[in-house]
Structures are given as structure tokens and as C-alpha cells.
Amino acid sequence: MRKMKMNKFNIDNLNLFYGENQALKQICLPIPNRQVTALIGPSGCGKSTLLRCLNRMNDLIEGVKIDGLLSMDGEDVYGNIDVAQLRIKVGMVFQKPNPFPMSIYENVAYGLRAQGIKDKKVLDGVVEQSLRGAALWDEVKDRLKSHAFSLSGGQQQRLCIARTIAMEPEVILMDEPTSALDPIATKKIEDLMESLKKDFTIVIVTHSMQQARRISDRTAFFLMGELVEHDDTHALFSNPRDDRTRGYVNGDFG
């Protein structure tokens, strides 16, 4: 039986420095399994930095120093682990759609081919399953050989989600995945997240408080590198404990 209330990640006294600049300050945050957790706050508050800690994307930035504990299923993410495998388990969808310059089919199959999977029946099955999972199959099933760039922006973003799903991750990180999309495409992505959380843990960075309220189960509010407050989303927006949270969700600053 699936244990919905277990935490996928536990973050304890996490600090991150870019050189001498401290971007995250003693962050303590549980991220529950198979729920949507939204990270909100004004620009530069540290929410995207924390998101990138979860799959060690910050390792790619020169001069980054991290201390504290970040565990996934009880295993130290910054311990002696295979980072490539971590990034398969913890997939990422970026702010702007970034399909590869190849066909729709090959975008989804790319990661599988990179792992040495060549069986066409296996590839066909995973491509269809992943596109269905991203609510895109019915729109593209008759043109899988078409170039990915022929898709609309919203379709391209769902293709990127399908590409992530194909690798069978446990977690999907989303860094403002709808900020470049129109309202109709945004609604499709939001509806998709509701269905995806049945199988995946989702952590999303969003500048839209309305979006956080619509889609997330838990919300964490960041300000100047600090985690000010985290709670059930309804509770955080309707009855915040901290005056800074109240000011932000009321639109007093942002």
C-alpha cells in the first residue's frame, strides 16, 4: 500500500553559499511524498536555488558551497552517491520549454536510447505511455515523426514533461513551468500536475500565488534566503502565522 504521508525529502539546517554570498540560510523543510509542494517568494529569495539542490544541479555552478543535511528516502543527497542516477530519479522541467532539435518521438525516446535501450517495441510503448502521461498523446499520435519545434509552446512543455516521465523518475522538479505560456496552456499543465502527483512527488517554483493556491498541497514561503513559513497550502494562505507571509500573500510586496 502506498504511504502518502511519508516525506520524500528531509532538509535540515541547509546552507548554501555562492562564494561569500549566502543564498540559503538554515533551511529546514520536509517535502512529502506524492504531493505537490510549491515554493513561493519574491525574486532572489532562494526558492529556485533550493529546487536545484534537490537534484544537485547547483554542483554545476562554480564556487558553490553547501552544508547541512538533505536526504531523499533517508539517503544523503550530498553523500557518496551516483549523481547521474540521482538526476534520473529527480527529473526537472525548466521555465521555458526546451525540446531537443529532433522529432516528437525521438525527444521522448532520447533518454532510453542513451541508456542502451534499442528494442522498438519497448521504445514505442514507453513513448506512448509517457505522452499519455503528459496528456499529449491524442494531440500528436498521428505526427510522431514531426519536428518538436512544430508544436505550440504549451505542447512543447508537455513534451518536456513526457521526456522526463519516460525515465521513470520518482520526483519531478518544475521551475516556473508555465511562466512562458498562455492561460489555456497553463491550465493544461496545472491539470496535468493534479494527475501526475498520484505517481510522482512534485516540487514547483512559482511566482504566481494564485497558481500555488490552485495546484499545491503544501506551500513554503521564502524571503532573502530564509524559509519564513511552510504549511498546508490552504492554511498558509488563509491564516499565515508570520506577518511577512501575510504581507506577501496579501500583495503588500513581491
Swiss-Prot record:
Subcellular location: Cell inner membrane
Gene3D superfamilies registered for this protein in UniProt: P-loop containing nucleotide triphosphate hydrolases
Its EC number(s): 7.3.2.1
Any single GO BP term: phosphate ion transmembrane transport
Gene Ontology MF, one: ATPase-coupled phosphate ion transmembrane transporter activity
UniProt key word Plastid: no
Residues in ABC transporter domain copies: 9-249
Entry keywords, A to Z: ATP-binding, Cell inner membrane, Cell membrane, Membrane, Nucleotide-binding, Phosphate transport, Translocase, Transport
InterPro entries (alphabetical): AAA+_ATPase, ABC_transporter-like_ATP-bd, ABC_transporter-like_CS, P-loop_NTPase, PstB-like
Keyword match Transport: yes
Catalytic activity: phosphate(out) + ATP + H2O = ADP + 2 phosphate(in) + H(+)
Enzyme class: translocase
Protein topology in the membrane: Peripheral membrane protein
GO cellular component, one term: plasma membrane
Primary location: membrane
Binding site for ATP: 41-48
Subunit details: The complex is composed of two ATP-binding proteins (PstB), two transmembrane proteins (PstC and PstA) and a solute-binding protein (PstS).
Function: Part of the ABC transporter complex PstSACB involved in phosphate import. Responsible for energy coupling to the transport system.
Similarity-based family: Belongs to the ABC transporter superfamily. Phosphate importer (TC 3.A.1.7) family.
Name of this chain's protein: Phosphate import ATP-binding protein PstB 2
